[in-house]
């Protein structure tokens, strides 16, 4: 049981104690225990490291509270970000990064690295024929500016002592004892911090609106951890890797706005994030950093976790508060806004995970420090989940204004298998697809809005030349239809109609006028829908129409999909000059559509062919083509 801190002086003393303990660790092994690396078996690597070090008599500590001289710190850290190369293990103080680690590598890591001080080349990262020993030298990391993610991968996410050792909760102490609430709001406003979960509303302005309700004795802070975009995992990694940072940001928001209760809304599909947040909240309560009379200041703040059922629409503010209240997650008409009447009808400050995680550093280091990177209208950094047909997938953080080209080619390592770049889908189902023409566009709120996309929560899906853009539009529209709450007719019926048209087109049944109808429906949905989900639902269709209308026309008029992705528009033929008559294709065909004699060219009956592609995939001579 941790002893409760009753004053600022006790807090500073405890913080200094853990800072000293951290500095005294001569060597550290940081085993990535984010969701991806855990799925890859890194927990087994961690347990084997602990077991073998104990057997070999190597002094090993897993907590700063059990510190002894000349020990090796063994930590279960959060996500390191380089998911493509996981499971990952980092060795300090050298900063060495080992990739694709397995239990079978543990003995060599202990003998050669921990005891021998040598780098194991076969576990190092290689790119372009060059071996990289230090994590910071790897191009994936070198081009980044990690602020929100600074300590993800460097501390034990389930230890409040580790968070205190890096200056954690220092911003809270400063906010409580050295600043007035209006000063906190002003610093956040001056920093230019904008919401990192969607449209980029100024955070300081929102806080000021909640703080202005001085007549209300009850106000709430709500953290939106309902990360629903396909392929996005920024908030999850932040909650898993540095949960105390999010909690501290929320408490500071409570001090600034006069709110005394907070809710973190996390989707139940994030069990590790829920667990680590729960542990962090209990630890903060034990130390007196949450609850009544925090640090003896007289300020009270209580925090709860609410697990959502995974509905995408619950990422919308009013739908989220309805869900927390126990009602069906459905958006409501605005005004009133949540800052006036939100959770339980009270003024509510609602920001997303990354927004709150930026707050502690802004309070400690100041608005000018935060604005030292980024663009004039979009200061600071932004975390992105880089996925798709790119060499290096993972979690990245770059200054606002970084170009797409830098992200895809310098950080991501370019397109897989040497193929040509085609598009990037940014902003999830509410975002849009950008092309080669947009590669040098600064990624900030205003520039992307002009290009017909949004930053959103930060999902980046890279697509190569083999991606069908009509299918991409259909995928996102199908997602929107499934996730629509059904409350308003434009979204419920309009998106269904758009999906019907897109499905027809991909099946080869497109008609003249479909493109015009898609645009007309999109405009109607944007102008008439009740909430942000509906208003932005047509974005993937509109952006693909704007940038790839020729593909739509090929599907509709030529009955052709240039990538071969739309099976209904694909015809398989056998090249008689290449076919050896081995009969493998005929034996593999589930529809019996292929005939021919042994050692003679075969033939595919297009009437029987179900276009599964099994023949082409199995042909050892490459004789089967897509026509």
Sequence positions of predicted segments:
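C-terminal accessory/binding modules appended to enzymatic or scaffolding proteins
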Residues: 380-392, 398, 404, 562-610, ...
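Flexible inter-domain linker/hinge segments
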Residues: 124-190, 345, 351-366
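Accessory "access/gating" subregions that flank catalytic or transport cores
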Residues: 173-215, 371-372, 377, 385, ...
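Conserved phosphate/anionic-ligand binding catalytic regions in large, soluble enzymes, centered on
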Residues: 33-41, 84, 188-210, 253, ...
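Short amphipathic, charge-patterned alpha-helical segments
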Residues: 249-251, 401-416
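Gly-rich Lys/Arg/Thr-decorated short loops/hinges at beta-loop-alpha junctions or inter-strand turns
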Residues: 32, 155-170, 223-235, 338-343, ...
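Hydrophobic alpha-helical positions that pack around
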Residues: 274-400, 412
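Ferredoxin-type iron-sulfur electron-transfer modules in oxidoreductases and energy-metabolism complexes
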Residues: 2-27, 43-74, 85-87, 92-125, ...
């Amino acid at each position: 049981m941790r002893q409760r801190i009753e004053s600022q002086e006790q807090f500073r003393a405890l913080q200094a104690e853990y800072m000293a303990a951290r500095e005294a660790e001569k060597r550290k092994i940081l085993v990535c225990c984010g969701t991806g690396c855990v799925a890859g078996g890194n927990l087994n690597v961690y347990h084997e490291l602990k077991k073998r070090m104990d057997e070999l008599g190597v002094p090993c500590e897993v907590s700063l509270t059990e510190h002894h001289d000349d020990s090796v710190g063994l930590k279960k850290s959060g996500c390191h970000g380089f998911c493509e190369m996981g499971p990952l293990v980092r060795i300090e103080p050298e900063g060495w990064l080992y990739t694709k680690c397995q239990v079978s590598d543990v003995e060599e890591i202990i003998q050669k690295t921990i005891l021998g001080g040598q780098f194991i080349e076969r576990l190092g990262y290689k790119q372009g024929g060059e071996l990289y020993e230090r994590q910071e030298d790897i191009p994936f990391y070198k081009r980044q500016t990690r602020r929100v993610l600074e300590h993800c991968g460097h501390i034990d996410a389930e230890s409040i002592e580790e968070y205190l050792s890096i200056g954690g909760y220092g911003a809270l102490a400063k906010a409580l004892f050295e600043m007035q609430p209006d000063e906190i709001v002003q610093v956040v406003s001056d920093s230019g911090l904008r919401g990192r979960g969607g449209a980029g509303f100024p955070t300081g302005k929102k806080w000021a609106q909640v703080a202005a309700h001085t007549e209300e004795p009850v106000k709430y802070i709500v953290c939106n951890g309902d990360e629903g975009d396909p392929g996005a995992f920024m908030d999850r990694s932040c909650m898993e890797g540095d949960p105390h940072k999010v909690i501290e940001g929320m408490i500071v928001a409570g001090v600034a706005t006069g709110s005394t209760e907070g809710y973190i809304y996390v989707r139940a599909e994030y069990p590790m994030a829920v667990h680590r947040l729960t542990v962090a909240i209990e630890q903060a309560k034990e130390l007196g950093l949450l609850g009544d009379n925090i640090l003896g200041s007289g300020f009270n703040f209580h925090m709860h976790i609410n697990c959502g059922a995974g509905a995408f629409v619950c990422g919308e503010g009013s739908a989220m508060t309805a869900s927390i209240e126990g009602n069906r997650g459905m958006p409501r008409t605005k005004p009133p806004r949540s800052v006036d009447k939100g959770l339980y009808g009270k003024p509510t400050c609602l920001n997303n995970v990354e927004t709150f995680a930026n707050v502690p550093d802004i309070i400690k280091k100041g608005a000018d420090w935060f604005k030292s990177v980024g663009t004039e209208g979009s200061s600071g950094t932004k975390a992105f989940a880089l996925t798709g047909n790119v060499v290096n997938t993972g979690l990245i953080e770059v200054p606002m204004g970084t170009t797409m080209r830098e992200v895809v080619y310098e950080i991501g390592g370019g397109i897989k298998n040497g193929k040509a770049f085609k598009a990037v889908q940014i902003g999830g189902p509410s975002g849009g697809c950008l092309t080669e023409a947009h590669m040098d566009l600064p990624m900030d709120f205003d520039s992307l809005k002009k290009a017909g996309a949004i930053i959103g929560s930060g999902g980046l899906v890279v697509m190569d030349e083999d991606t069908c853009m009509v299918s991409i539009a259909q995928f996102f529209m199908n997602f929107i239809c499934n996730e629509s709450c059904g409350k308003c007719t434009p979204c419920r019926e309009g998106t269904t109609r758009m999906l019907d048209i897109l499905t027809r087109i991909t099946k080869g049944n497109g008609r003249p006028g479909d493109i015009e109808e898609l645009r007309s429906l999109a405009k109607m949905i944007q102008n008439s829908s009740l909430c942000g989900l509906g208003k932005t639902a047509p974005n993937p269709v509109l952006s693909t129409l704007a940038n790839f209308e020729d593909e739509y026309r090929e599907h509709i008029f030529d009955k052709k999909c240039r990538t071969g992705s739309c099976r209904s528009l694909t015809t398989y033929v056998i090249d008689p000059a290449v076919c050896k008559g081995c009969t493998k294709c005929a034996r593999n065909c589930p529809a019996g559509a292929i005939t021919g004699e042994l050692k003679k060219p075969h033939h595919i009956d297009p009437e029987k062919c179900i276009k599964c592609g099994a023949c082409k995939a199995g042909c050892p001579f490459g004789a089967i083509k897509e026509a």
